Amino acid sequence: GLLSVLGSVVKHVIPHVVPVIAEHL
């Protein structure tokens, strides 16, 4: 369902977002 797709997107996005946030901290 839609939630499954959202979950997959989140799991793919988080690993890319975390390092970017860490660089700015």
Swiss-Prot record:
Modified residues (Leucine amide): 25
One Gene Ontology CC term in the entry: extracellular region
Subcellular location(s) of the protein: Secreted
GO biological process: defense response to bacterium
Tissue-specificity statement: Expressed by the skin parotoid and/or rostral glands.
Primary location recorded for the protein, binned into one broad class: secreted
InterPro entries in the record: Caerin_1
Stored Pfam families: Caerin_1
Alphabetical UniProt keywords: Amidation, Amphibian defense peptide, Antibiotic, Antimicrobial, Secreted
Comment block on domains: Contains two amphipathic alpha helix regions separated by a region of less-defined helicity and greater flexibility.
Function: Antibacterial peptide, that adopts an alpha helical conformation which can disrupt bacterial membranes. Each caerin displays a different antimicrobial specificity.
Similarity comment: family membership: Belongs to the frog skin active peptide (FSAP) family. Caerin subfamily.
Name listed for the protein in its UniProt record: Caerin-1.5
